[in-house]
Amino acid sequence: MRIGLDLDGRLDERPDFFAFLTAALRSGGHFVAVLTYRDPASQAKTEAQLSGWGVAYDEIHFARSLSDKGRLCRELAIDVYFDDQDECVVGVGEKTTVFKIRNGGNFDFGEQKWLSIAKLTRLL
């Protein structure tokens, strides 16, 4: 399986979880790509950050825009893609399963309850 992970607003929200997930995926022979809209000039810093978090990956790609991640998913033949923004999942292609996860999760800590689908849809 080929997995794509957004960095900012997704992977950096729970690097411990994604370190565990990527290690398990790669040890199972799966391909992991990190897709980010960071400046390509920050590649060394970004790679150091991922290494510091223990995130295992095969490739890192720097998108030219948020919507460019769709093209990258198609070119890399990504099967499953995790992101947090609508603009990033446009154009991924029908063969890619998208897990779009809102920043901060789906629990309203102020109200101390899970968000309903209707409320979550309005927020998104």
Residue ranges and their predicted role:
Residues 1-66:
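Alpha-helical substrate-recognition element adjacent to the catalytic core
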Residues 41-124:
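C-terminal cap/substrate-recognition subdomain and adjoining C-terminal extension
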